[in-house]
């Protein structure tokens, strides 16, 4: 499927393969040539370095939004990331994510719009941070549960 559009894969170095890089997809455009690096097992590192996330995973999208990253998403083909699930996630995350149809040209247009308009990117990031809250929520909940049980033991 890469051939008709002109995209090409670039050969990996041994060091890249050792560091979790699976491959590179490079554009045919000579004026604005760029490559997409495909990585496995380095989610946190890639997320931290990303300007935008194309996300098709519930928890992954929520983690990206929680770090202030804009997310472009669309229903997947499998049973887990269905249209129903994506709509529920959109209600949770609001305008920190762009919910698109499975139309490549529409998705690409949305990605370019976000990446080329700093105000949209910043707004989506701010909404994500607000929706997901500050880091440390799970720790705070665990401490509250521990305090509850500690009080219960003293009352006995």
Please report, for each region that a protein language model flagged, where it lies by residue.
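Nucleotide-activated sugar donor-binding and catalytic core shared by glycosyltransferases
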Residues: 1-156
């Amino acid at each position: 499927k890469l051939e008709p559009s002109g995209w090409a894969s670039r050969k990996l170095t041994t060091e890249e393969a050792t560091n979790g890089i699976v491959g590179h997809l490079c554009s045919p455009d000579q004026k604005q040539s760029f490559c997409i690096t495909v990585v496995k097992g380095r989610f946190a590192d890639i997320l931290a370095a990303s300007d935008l996330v194309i996300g098709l995973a519930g928890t992954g999208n929520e983690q990206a939004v929680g770090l202030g990253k804009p997310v472009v998403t669309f229903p997947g083909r499998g049973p887990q990331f269905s249209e129903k699930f994506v709509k529920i996630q959109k209600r949770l995350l609001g305008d920190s994510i762009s919910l698109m149809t499975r139309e490549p040209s529409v998705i690409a247009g949305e990605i370019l719009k976000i990446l080329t308009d700093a105000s949209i990117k910043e707004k989506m990031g701010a909404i994500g941070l607000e929706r997901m809250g500050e880091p440390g929520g799970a720790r705070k909940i665990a401490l509250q549960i521990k305090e509850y049980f500690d009080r219960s033991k003293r009352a006995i």
